[in-house]
From Swiss-Prot:
GO terms for biological process: aerobic respiration; electron transport coupled proton transport; photosynthesis, light reaction. Belongs to the complex I 20 kDa subunit family. NDH shuttles electrons from NAD(P)H:plastoquinone, via FMN and iron-sulfur (Fe-S) centers, to quinones in the photosynthetic chain and possibly in a chloroplast respiratory chain. The immediate electron acceptor for the enzyme in this species is believed to be plastoquinone. Couples the redox reaction to proton translocation, and thus conserves the redox energy in a proton gradient. This is NAD(P)H-quinone oxidoreductase subunit K, chloroplastic. Keywords: 4Fe-4S, Chloroplast, Iron, Iron-sulfur, Membrane, Metal-binding, NAD, NADP, Plastid, Plastoquinone, Quinone, Thylakoid, Translocase, Transport. It is found in: Plastid, Chloroplast thylakoid membrane. It is a peripheral membrane protein. GO terms for cellular component: chloroplast thylakoid membrane; respiratory chain complex I.
Length: 225
């Protein structure tokens, strides 16, 4: 029998002690065990299914697909999202425990794609329903692109701090402390520019008395003069 030799334990302090923080340890454990909830409604999801095979082997990233949103921390949306499916998608996202992440895969998920042209039943962008962490364009994206999106998400998780995980509102999802983004006032305030509703002062104005003075049809030249 072949003898098994165990390596000699290095007793030096520099190689046997690891200094880290609880935040880094938590990030490392989460990025190494992402459990995705697969939400595929169209053809883009076929490309993700090829990752399950031995050629790409997405299990090496610790991805374990789950069928229940309560056990998942990543939802991967692929395909067209219709108005009828929108409530189901939002319900699945709300049932996922925090912290949770979203990858939008494909042009139809990101912008609505060709199905949103003159369509009243297609959602033009899944980010109108749930916050998105990584956008993956393509029609459809290649499996290598999906792996790249997962790698970028892992890097984002590795840089997170505790304050970034507290996201009570959907509007603050894109703001992270470590990225040093500036908080901009929401444009959807309802206070529209009233100047756009009126013609500029350089145009000719016709008084109400002049307009109602004429009972019979007259030319526009007479009204202006």
């Amino acid at each position: 029998m072949n003898s098994i030799k165990f390596p000699v334990l290095d007793r030096t302090t520099t190689n046997s002690v690891i200094s880290t923080t609880l935040n880094d340890l938590s990030n490392w454990s989460r990025l190494s065990s992402l459990w995705p909830l697969l939400y595929g409604t169209s053809c883009c999801f076929i490309e993700f299914a090829s990752l399950i095979g031995s050629r790409f082997d997405f299990d090496r990233y610790g991805l374990v697909p789950r069928s229940s949103p309560r056990q998942a921390d990543l939802i991967l949306t692929a395909g067209t999202v219709t108005m009828k499916m929108a409530p189901s998608l939002v319900r699945l996202y709300e049932q996922m425990p925090e912290p949770k992440y979203v990858i939008a895969m494909g042009a139809c998920t990101i912008t609505g794609g060709m199905f949103s042209t003159d369509s009243y039943s297609t959602v033009r962008g899944v980010d109108k329903l749930i916050p998105v962490d990584v956008y993956l364009p393509g029609c459809p994206p290649k499996p290598e692109a999906v792996i790249d999106a997962i790698t970028k998400l892992r890097k984002k998780i590795a840089r997170e701090i505790y304050k970034d995980r507290i996201r009570p509102q959907q509007g603050n999802r894109c703001f992270t402390t470590n990225h040093k983004f500036f908080v901009v006032r929401s444009p959807h305030t309802g206070n529209y520019d009233q100047e756009l509703l009126y013609p500029p002062s350089s145009t000719s104005e016709i008084s109400t008395e002049t307009f109602f003075k004429y009972k019979s049809p007259v030319s526009s030249h007479e009204l202006v003069n």
